[in-house]
Amino acid sequence: MFKTNNVTARLFERQICTPAPGTSIHRARRFYENVVPSYTIYDVECPDHSFRKFTDDGLYFVSFSRNHQDLVVYRPTWLTFSCKEEDCDTHDLPLKARKFESFFTQLYSVTLASSGELICKDFFLYMESNQFGLFATSTAQIHDAPPTGGAIQGVPSVEKITFHLLRLVDGAILDERVFHNDYVNLAHSIGAFLYDDLLAIVSLRYQRIHILQIRDSGDLVDVRAIGEFCREDDELFLNSNSQVLVNHVGNGFHHSLPQSETSFLSGIKQRLLSYIFRGIWNEADQTMRVQCLKKKFYFHFQDYIDLIIWKVQFLDRHHLLIKFGSVDGGVSRNADIHPSFFAVYNMETTEIVAFYQNSADELYFLFELFSDHFHVSSKSSLHMNFMSSHSNNIHALEQLRCTKNKATNFSQFVKKMMASLPCSCQSQSPSPYFDQSLFRFDEKLISAIDRHRQSTDHPIKFISRRQPNILKFKMKPGPEAGSTDGRTKKICSFLFHPILPLALSVQQTLFLQASVVNIHFRR
């Protein structure tokens, strides 16, 4: 049903009408159809920083110094200026109002990187309930590092990786966690996942999932490490068993002692093989059982042994979605071409409860129907619970099914869709301007996913969803007059405030030229 676009009429309607139960926030978000970032300040004079993102509650704007040594945090404010003449809306903004400082107030600058380290500009996780921020610094990669101490052959090494937990209110460093001669994929926060107060960090080099708890005091506390061992007392049990064997040898009972680094499969790998074997063993037909054991288990046994953990996400406080694949795929920039597997792991029972290949139809249909369960968010975060997905938005579902119908090979389509799993933590913007029930836009040019995209000299249009031919606003990255050199490849990122009609577009080239920052807001 058509609703008026007049803000005053909508305010009166909100006063006299009671929305249906459970729809009050959706009704309130419709006001964003009227309040849009329709005005642009081009090529804003701003600090030479690498801008990261707004926090999910909109209280902070995170950036890093260009030398990747310092964290610089701003408080978003709103433009204020005085006008002596009548009808101020028809005049250009005064020069002072067109600066970065008119929209952002610097709170502090903190040096995070020590000697030899650099801040990973793509890594930032925010704990909204305590207003804590998690950042990462690291030294350079060593690509041909020898696999010592049980490390995986072919995985690079980083001499020092440090995770810093900060209180964003004042920039105080509350705690740090250091990994030496290890490898954690820090790009786009792939190697870490935050769920409420639980933090999972994946060590690719040593194949461990470190589960930590972030206390209200700001302490990082070890909960468990999943990989070589699954239960807290596994290592104690194996060491005590080895001691018994040593005593037997001393008493004349000659047994071959196990080699600590090569005798046993890791705990998580043993759980995986056990799940696959039991699934086949439960086959009622004995002939079918024997054939499946030969074809699906013993024939691929070494392939399963060679799998390594690529990526992890929480499904809830007790279950992890773990992605397995080859060593090459784990460190490759384009892991989509490599076969992979997904396992659901229960941390309390230490059991694998589900296992799928990345081409499994069953997993895809689960993802299509229950996409929101993969994009888990903190219970305390109101803003993250209303992002559009194909399981909660009919327009997103239609777009997905259109893409699926165009696919010539359904198996390849499934693999392409499953490449996004496990989902990266806090990788989507909760801005209402990405709500597909309110606006329609070209997702090839802009979307809620936090990624750089190829820039265009044409404005990106946001069309009203209820009135399909009405342009609500448009955003143009780069200089107002367009690029003078059409051959130079340019990339662009968009940083939307989660609540206010405020966004930044940052256009940069691959030749270390100065970035072009535009501010889009409602005037």
Swiss-Prot record:
Chief location: nucleus
Alphabetically ordered keywords of this record: Nucleus, Phytochrome signaling pathway
Superkingdom assignment: Eukaryota
UniProt keyword Membrane, yes or no: no
Intracellular or extracellular location(s): Nucleus
Keyword hit for Nucleus: yes
Pfam families per UniProt: Det1
GO BP annotation list: carbohydrate metabolic process; positive regulation of proteasomal ubiquitin-dependent protein catabolic process; protein ubiquitination; red, far-red light phototransduction
Entries under InterPro entries matching the protein: 6-hairpin_glycosidase_sf, De-etiolated_protein_1_Det1
Ranges spanned by the short sequence motif Nuclear localization signal, renumbered to the chain: 401-416, 472-490
Cellular component terms per the entry's GO annotation: cullin-RING ubiquitin ligase complex; nucleus
Any one GO molecular function term: ubiquitin-like ligase-substrate adaptor activity
Subunit: Probable component of the CDD complex, which probably also contains DDB1.
Biological role stated in the UniProt entry: Component of light signal transduction machinery. Involved in fruit pigmentation and fruit nutritional quality. Acts as a negative regulator of fruit pigmentation. Probably acts by participating in the CDD complex, a complex probably required to regulate the activity of ubiquitin conjugating enzymes. Repression of photomorphogenesis is probably mediated by ubiquitination and subsequent degradation of photomorphogenesis-promoting factors such as HY5.
Family membership noted in the UniProt record: Belongs to the DET1 family.
Descriptive protein name: Light-mediated development protein DET1
